[in-house]
Amino acid sequence: TFRAITDKIPYLKKLGITTIELMPAYEFEEQVIPKKTVLPDYLKWESHGEDLIKPESVQPVEKINYWGYVPGNYFAPKASYSSSADAASEFRELVHTLHENGMECVMEFYFVPGMNQNVILDALRFWVREYHVDGFHLQGDSLPVTAAAQDLLLSRTKLFYTHFDPI
């Protein structure tokens, strides 16, 4: 939880750590729900009784996504990472305590291809304004990194990105 990290800050500081990077800590869907697909006609076959799978023998496959590299609600801290009902206050307290101890908070964000670039910039600005995060590690293709680096607010943060377009 965010509070558990806050409690470990003295230990992290003693180790000489100056920056923590949080994997996606914004709200995202944890339950992986498989998409139903319809087989094309050329893949359909005439089944026989012995070929059928009995419904009681099929076990549901539950997959939990703890990583966060999926589309998300980029404007809210992850509620399940909070030990209280107020994830926003708990995250704010984490960043504040890091700063009091001379440490920085960098957040990792994954944005899906084709996402509105203005929403991306707005989300990053939001986390700087609301929570005072110190930087971002951006994941995804064709992100507005140049615009972020030139933005009045975001230009004062650290930006990590590995998919720069060649000139």
Provide a role label for each language-model segment.
Residues 106:
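Active-site cores of enzymes that catalyze phosphoryl transfer or operate on phosphate-rich substrates
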Residues 42, 69, 101, 123-125, ...:
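Active-site-proximal helices and loops of the catalytic beta/alpha 8
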Residues 9, 92-95, 145-150:
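Short amphipathic alpha-helical segments and helix-helix/interface helices
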Residues 1:
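The feature marks proteins involved in alpha-glucan
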Residues 16, 100-103:
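Secondary-structure transition into beta-strands, especially the periplasmic turns and strand N-termini
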Residues 32-100, 111-130:
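Aromatic- and acidic-residue-enriched carbohydrate-binding clefts of CAZyme catalytic domains
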Residues 5-26, 62, 130:
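Catalytic domains of carbohydrate-active enzymes, especially glycoside hydrolases
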Residues 21-30, 109-114, 139-144, 163-166:
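Short, solvent-exposed turn/loop segments enriched in Gly/Ser/Thr/Pro and often Arg
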